[in-house]
């Protein structure tokens, strides 16, 4: 099949889907390519981002947590976006694309519930019906988000098959779409899956890095030494990285969830500790058994609990343009507490992984003058009960 855009990033990516879905992916690619050239579409998208979502988001200099070091640390405040996380950016773009293609329904999958909430709010705003697949386990651990989705008119469908988490929700959503794509658009929630999704999601998130670049130049008069973002599927990270890829002086650091520790096998770090395989319509590194079955990923943060990773991250890793590291649950929790206590910001547990790595860089080299930007991809309201239970069990509260 000929595509308008390259479906691969090096060897990663592709369109490994049943033949029945090829026309849907082709139609989506055509709609996206024409929308990118359509000033009216771009103006509508920009208007929603500004007047509905609240862009541009702030770039906040940390006042206190860098004390005693020579690090200057900024946070890109995607937590201030309507909906509470970076997810809102690209769902508005995809919902507009769905309308452009004449679709009336949205299908989505969600783990932490953030993408589900974003899909529900975009659907409510633009008059689309919305059904969201969510692992039954996640439905339990993210009840506030489930209620938010339902308040905005979405149907939330708990998935009990397999491990009853995000990977199973992804499978069910794709299965639904293969029978309903004439009227429904599949609103994929991260920069992964079959082409053209990784490219679409990157382009609909790239304003994160574009704004960051302009803001840091205005505030500091130079580009940062590194930008740091957490990586599950990798959409907030690719949104931050995209505009810096050609700026070779800027380090790109992606932070995977180390869970209980890489050595325990209970983590979500397939990029550095998985094997390349085919899953969810793409060729990418993933967590798999010796026999090639997809393995359970694990993270304290439901939004990073994904057994694979977007193909462009796999490519950036393979050519050495970006560095990928991992942070454990405990390190992320420590960073979460630090930001709350010393900056008055409650970050999402996902974003806390990126922050934890920045704090590590700072503490390992207190005398090093470095300018760092962390993508604070979401707010932590959804995580306060999880954190409360852990701290209570430890006797810290």
Curated annotation (Swiss-Prot):
It comes from the Bacteria. It catalyses: (1S,2R)-1-C-(indol-3-yl)glycerol 3-phosphate + L-serine = D-glyceraldehyde 3-phosphate + L-tryptophan + H2O. GO terms for molecular function: tryptophan synthase activity. One of its GO terms (cellular component) is cytoplasm. Belongs to the TrpB family. PANTHER family: TRYPTOPHAN SYNTHASE, TRYPTOPHAN SYNTHASE-RELATED. This is Tryptophan synthase beta chain. It comes from Citrobacter koseri (strain ATCC BAA-895 / CDC 4225-83 / SGSC4696).
């Amino acid at each position: 099949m000929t595509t308008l855009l390259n479906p691969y990033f090096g060897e990663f990516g592709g369109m490994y889907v049943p033949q029945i879905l090829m026309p849907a992916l082709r139609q989506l690619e055509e709609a996206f390519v024409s929308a990118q050239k359509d000033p009216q579409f771009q103006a509508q998208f920009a208007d929603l981002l500004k007047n509905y979502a609240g862009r541009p988001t702030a770039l906040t200099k940390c006042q206190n947590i860098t004390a005693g070091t020579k690090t200057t640390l900024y946070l890109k405040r995607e937590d201030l976006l309507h909906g509470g996380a970076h997810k809102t950016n690209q769902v508005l773009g995809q919902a507009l694309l769905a309308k452009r293609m004449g679709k009336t329904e949205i299908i989505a999958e969600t783990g932490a519930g953030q993408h589900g909430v974003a899909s529900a709010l975009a659907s409510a705003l633009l008059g689309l019906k919305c059904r969201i697949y969510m692992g039954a386990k996640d439905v339990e651990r993210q009840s506030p988000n489930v209620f938010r989705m339902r308040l905005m008119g979405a149907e939330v469908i708990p998935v009990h098959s397999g491990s009853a988490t995000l990977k199973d929700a992804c499978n069910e959503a794709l299965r639904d779409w293969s029978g309903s794509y004439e009227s429904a658009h599949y609103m994929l929630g991260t920069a992964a899956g079959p082409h053209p999704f990784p490219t679409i999601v990157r382009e609909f998130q790239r304003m994160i890095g574009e704004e960051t670049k302009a803001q840091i130049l205005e505030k500091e008069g130079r580009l940062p030494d590194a930008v740091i973002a957490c990586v599950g599927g990798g959409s907030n990270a690719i949104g931050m990285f995209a505009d810096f890829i050609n700026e070779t002086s800027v380090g790109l650091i992606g932070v995977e969830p180390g869970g209980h520790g890489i050595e325990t096998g209970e983590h979500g770090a397939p990029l550095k500790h998985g094997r390349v395989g085919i899953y969810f319509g793409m060729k990418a590194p993933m967590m798999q058994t010796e026999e090639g079955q997809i393995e359970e990923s694990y993270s304290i943060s439901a939004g990073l609990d994904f057994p694979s990773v977007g193909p462009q991250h796999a490519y950036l890793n393979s050519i050495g343009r970006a560095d990928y590291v991992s942070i454990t649950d405990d390190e992320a929790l420590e960073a979460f507490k630090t930001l709350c206590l010393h900056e008055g910001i409650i970050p999402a547990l996902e974003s806390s992984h990126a922050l934890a790595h920045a704090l590590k860089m700072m503490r390992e080299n207190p005398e090093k003058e470095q300018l760092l930007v962390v993508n604070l991809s979401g707010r932590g309201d959804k995580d306060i009960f999880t954190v409360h239970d852990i701290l209570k069990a430890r006797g810290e509260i």
